[in-house]
């Protein structure tokens, strides 16, 4: 590993590798091989310091990957961060046997779906992918609670706001009728009084949260963590 890589934290390194791979070659849909570097890095980290069984797993795309304050935001909770930037729900499902099931978590918080919609999937398609993820987890961990952290609009992807809302609705209704599935509403957290997304909770790309964005997200997620 080069010197520059040694200086990067694991989340930043994974995001760098992901973006670098995507820049070199636009992958075909469901080309899971593009995530092998990120998943292998997680497995190596697990070998060096195995997470405790029965913890609280956070998985998903860049919102999870870049949540660098996750452990500090939830003191006293055994949280595990397994976000990989640019990923879709199908990717989390595909790699569940490697970065979900081995931890036997009591809860799995999934924040994903935005990249799916940005890639052209409908809310119904993303919802179907979410149900597949739940089925994969519950096939081996039937008592594990799967918690979907709902999507909220961003300035960079404002045109997808209604699709985000529709996906949230589908997941929310599914959670109400499905055991060990929960939904967290976040849609309104990014709106100002005029009904437009707040610019003060995003970094310059107007897509990813800054510290204030994560502070707000933390307040919405915290009540749903299980002791």
Describe every region a protein language model picked out:
Residues 1-58, 64, 68, 72-73, ...:
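N-terminal secretory targeting modules
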Residues 13-15, 153-227:
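Catalytic His-Asp segment of secreted/periplasmic serine-dependent ester chemistry enzymes
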Residues 45, 95-102, 136-137, 224:
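A generic secondary-structure signal
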Residues 49, 98, 115, 131-136, ...:
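Extracellular glycan-modifying ectodomains
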Residues 49-52, 73-74, 101-103, 139-141, ...:
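Extracellular/periplasmic catalytic domains that process cell-envelope and extracellular macromolecules
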Residues 56-59, 79-83, 107-112, 145-150, ...:
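Structural recognition of the beta-strand scaffold that forms the well-ordered cores
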Residues 64-80, 89-127, 147, 151-155:
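Oxyanion-hole/transition-state-stabilizing segment in secreted/luminal serine hydrolases
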Residues 123-133, 163-168:
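Charged helix-capping and loop-helix junction motifs
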């Amino acid at each position: 590993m080069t010197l520059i890589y040694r200086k990067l934290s694991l989340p930043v390194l994974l995001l760098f590798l992901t973006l670098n791979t995507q820049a070199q070659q636009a992958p075909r849909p469901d080309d899971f091989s593009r995530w092998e570097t990120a998943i292998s890095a997680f497995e190596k980290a697990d070998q060096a310091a195995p997470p405790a069984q029965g913890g609280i797993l956070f998985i998903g795309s860049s919102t999870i990957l870049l949540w660098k304050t996750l452990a500090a935001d939830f003191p006293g909770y055994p949280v595990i961060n397994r976000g990989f930037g640019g990923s879709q729900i199908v990717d989390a499902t595909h790699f569940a046997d490697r970065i979900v099931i081995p931890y036997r978590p009591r809860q799995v918080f999934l924040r994903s779906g935005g990249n799916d919609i940005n890639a052209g999937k409908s809310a119904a398609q993303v919802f179907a992918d979410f149900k597949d993820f739940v089925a994969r987890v519950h096939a081996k961990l039937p008592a594990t609670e799967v918690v979907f952290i709902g999507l909220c609009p961003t300035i960079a992807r404002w045109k997808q706001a209604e699709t985000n809302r529709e996906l949230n609705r589908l997941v929310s209704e599914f959670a109400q009728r499905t055991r060990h599935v929960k939904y967290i509403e976040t849609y309104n957290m990014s709106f100002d009084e005029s009904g437009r997304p707040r610019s003060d909770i995003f970094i310059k790309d107007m897509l990813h949260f800054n510290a204030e964005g994560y502070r707000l997200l933390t307040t919405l997620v915290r009540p749903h963590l299980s002791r």
